[in-house]
Amino acid sequence: MGPEALAQVVRPLAEIFRPEDYPDLLVGLETGDDAAIYRVSEELAIIFTTDFFTPVVDDPYEYGAISAVNAMSDVYAMGGDVVLALNICGFPRDMPPEIKAEILRGGAEKVADAGGVIAGGHTLDDDEPKYGLALIGFVHPDEFAAKVGARPGDVLFLTKRLGVGIITTAAKGGVAEENHMRGAVEQMLLLNRRAARLMKRVRCHAVTDITGFALIGHSLEMAQLSGVTLRFQIDRLPFLDGAREYAEEWLFPAGASCNKDAYESHVTFSSGIPDEVQMLLFTPETSGGLLICVDPKDADTLAALFSEQGQEYWIVGEAIEGPGAIEIL
């Protein structure tokens, strides 16, 4: 569902569940964050989220693993640890049992890698395969991360390359080179766990993960909630091998146009940035990285921590005073 349609569907819920009536709901509908957070004691809050989607790769094991990693990313974007998961499955009746088992095995092994446990789930018959997770994570109620809170001067860190969406679309069309698709798959299989743990050692004012609403959509949500403008340097943005090549061939998924229609009025591009590169920034990602707004005094510290622990990162821009918009220079 596109961002505008989603907002229209969810809007009535805010009138039923007013934030002032639920003081222990620390993060809920009002901010549209990556997950909900509910305080259960002075020392503990639970993070609750769910995500599932149709296959982005042909291999059933990798599909299950990627879907699980993508779902768990919301817990990491909130600064938490994965604890408990339930499978969400929609499978065709004629799908062989061994393929279903491989999908579930892929998801299960990634949840185990994250330190969590799968305790059950729900299945239904569906013409098109769907798989994902409902998740519970833990976080201290005073130490969670959120989209809101970015401040002018913050340094923007990104922990994964962009371009998964266009590469997987090219693969579905049979035109992606094998090494390009393999690079996208390997990135999608990477947990955001290490980056999330390291970012908590410095002053991070706002965090989100880059998934279906693309770099521009998710960063715009952060900018608007925080009351700042996020300025990105186009030459600092990292792209997977092949992404710009397929962009030049205009092999964009339909979701890119939906995102552009929803967000382009809030984005300013410098002249000279090619149309296809602009469109890449509206293109949905799967199992993307974290976008972290770091206090400028702590940017060098986080960069050093990431480097020491083998965590890839790119410093891609800064937060500035502004009306809640995006600038691409």
Residue spans of the language-model regions?
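Helix-biased detector of long, well-ordered alpha-helical tracts
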Residues: 1-329
